[in-house]
Amino acid sequence: MLERTLRVLEYNKVKEQLLEHTASSLGRDKVKNLVPSTDFEEIVEMQDTTDEAAKVIRLKGSAPLGGITDIRSNVKRAKIGSMLSPNELLDIANTMYGSRNMKRFIEDMVDNGVELPILETHVAQIVSLYDLEKKITNCIGDGGEVVDSASDKLRGIRTQIRTAESRIREKLENMTRSSNSQKMLSDSIVTIRNERYVIPVKQEYRGVYGGIVHDQSASGQTLFIEPQVIVELNNALQEARVKEKQEIERILLMLTEEVAVEADIVLSNVEVVANLDFIFAKAFYAKRIKATKPIVNNERYMDLRQARHPLIDPEVIVPNNIMLGKDFTTIVITGPNTGGKTVTLKTVGICVLMAQSGLHIPVMDESEICVFKNIFADIGDEQSIEQSLSTFSSHMVNIVDILEKADFESLVLFDELGAGTDPQEGAALAISILDEVCNRGARVVATTHYPELKAYGYNREQVINASVEFDVNTLSPTYKLLIGVPGRSNAFEISKRLGLSDRVIDQARNHISTDTNKIENMIAKLEESQKNAERDWNEAEALRKQSEKLHRELQRQIIEFNEERDERLLKAQKEGEEKVEAAKKEAEGIIQELRQLRKAQLANVKDHELIEAKSRLEGAAPELVKKQKVNVKNTAPKQQLRAGDEVKVLTFGQKGQLLEKVSDTEWSVQIGILKMKVKESNMEYINTPKQTEKKAVATVKGRDYHVSLELDLRGERFENAMARVEKYLDDAQLASYPRVSIIHGKGTGALRQGVQDYLKKHRGVKTFRYGDMGEGGLGVTVVELK
């Protein structure tokens, strides 16, 4: 990506915000080196990885990345034989613990059923070095000191040191407390100079204690003397301290060598936790800006739903739907300055850069974005003063560079294209520049305030006009993007609300051509139609969501009903079996008594009569089958099934009608208001509804056959619309019409594309085209019939 593009789209500001969510310098280095990728597979994997980290945050709130530091230089020094300090070794131990803890954290979530395949692969690379970690922490305390327990020898040496220090202090304190010494000492304290214990003696008594003078006060009146009686003890103390230092160095060298042996593993672990820190920083940032994972496609179109700029407060900014690349490859946003056009432009650019960097973007779920090899942006004139160039010249230098490099894999963003020069020439240049980049197949978003470009949006198939809505009542932009509606200046309305007289405004209107007035009125009507369509869509969307909610609730109730029914049936069966078993036992007892009576000759009963009696008892008991859930046949119904057949769905015990076969073993079935997939093994054939006999219909050719010259499909569902188009074209041919119009509206373009795809295949169609400005523009297709 060009450095200028990253700068004008404020990519580095996004990275600055991302830095705030890293846990270590390792993660910060990753963020600082972050640049957008152009590799499709890599971008998809990065998005999936960020999504997994976001799932962890949703479930756990955080990730255990504390205590991790950049130990790479220390490990490399250990590898070449340098001795590491206690704090450096402690950092290594803490980082090894942090990596081990992170590995355990992710693996525990996976063991509990959370699907994290990518993060699981990452932590699988972490090798536990628990033994080395414990060796270091057993030798070095939290404060970075080598502890007594590091070795038996060190413990013994430090015992000697403490004993020597105690004896020295005892002798010196006795001296300072002596009444004879009070007049000779400047102060009754024991202090240290040059790592040896001394007492402060007045200058005139320097010869009383003998020993060694180590220091004197600033005035020279006090000498810090090591008395002769403790010189040997101080010497012994110093020798012990030397031994302590040697033992500490031996321990540190031993630990350093242990680190050197595992250096490659330690460095590998560090790289993994650096990546994990970076990954979770992206996930935390996504949570901060309320971003979601986009669907990444490789088909050069984007569909950003409720897109917001990440650097603007989400509570303040107005989200917009932005589509580019399917029905049109270029959006020309027209309208007055300070209307929010540039924010929309930057939103598109920064969302693409973020997505290609593996960052989630501030849009609604199911938004799609594509991968661009190059992103070019001509926004602002921040360099014009430095380069002593005019606004127009600075823009043109950049545009020339863009035209040299832009191709079908490029996204091009123009802000106020053609500005800074004569309006007529600027508009002409803008049109030529747009034609050039459009012809190369690039995806383009351009802003302009030139009215000439409004007509440009109507005259090019792959270009669509757009504007940012302006509220005349509040005299301020709403920042809502209106796709398909060109912008207008609103100068007359604003002037009127600000108090300008109607007479002056009417005179001003007379200075504008009739065509211009017609265009402005047409734009105003388009704006109103757009608002109405959007309102209708919102109402339909609300009804759809309500319907889906009711559908889910009904399905839930059906499942609960079946579960409760099965549970009650199972309970009843169990109770019945218990009663039958009790009856059998009672019968066995009776038979046994009869046998005993016969043996005692108290009854004359034959064996076959006993067996027959028991058989009658068992036959009287109903055969019960334990049932935990509804059993269905494993074989398909014997009757060959066809669409339209009535069947019984065994799971629900309900009748339904077959709609279509969706696989070798499954059908789509309509059960009341529900439509669901059902396996053939779970249904029972009932009957095939009788077909009503189709009667021949006489047709009349000519003007007496009443067929409208227009077919209005607005508001129709796609399947119904296609069926109406087929019938309408047949009727129009029967009526011998040479030309008809199909009104499909602009909308998302799906219906328009479906109509035109059908027309291409229809044998009765000679040619077709979009409507002219007076015929409905892109919202109408005019069809010439053979």
From Swiss-Prot:
Listed InterPro entries: DNA_mismatch_repair_MutS_C, DNA_mismatch_repair_MutS_core, DNA_mismatch_repair_MutS_sf, MSSS, MutS, MutS2, P-loop_NTPase, Smr_dom
Main enzyme class: hydrolase
Binding site for ATP: G335, P336, N337, T338, G339, G340, K341, T342
UniProt cross-references to CDD domains, sorted A to Z: ABC_MutS2 (cd03280), ATP-synt_Fo_b (cd06503)
Domain Smr: 711-786
E.C. number(s) listed in UniProt: 3.1.-.-, 3.6.4.-
Keyword terms: ATP-binding, DNA-binding, Endonuclease, Hydrolase, Nuclease, Nucleotide-binding, RNA-binding, rRNA-binding
Subunit-structure text: Homodimer. Binds to stalled ribosomes, contacting rRNA.
Function: Endonuclease that is involved in the suppression of homologous recombination and thus may have a key role in the control of bacterial genetic diversity.
Family to which the UniProt record says this protein belongs: Belongs to the DNA mismatch repair MutS family. MutS2 subfamily.
Name this protein carries in UniProt: Endonuclease MutS2
Organism: Bacillus thuringiensis subsp. konkukian (strain 97-27)
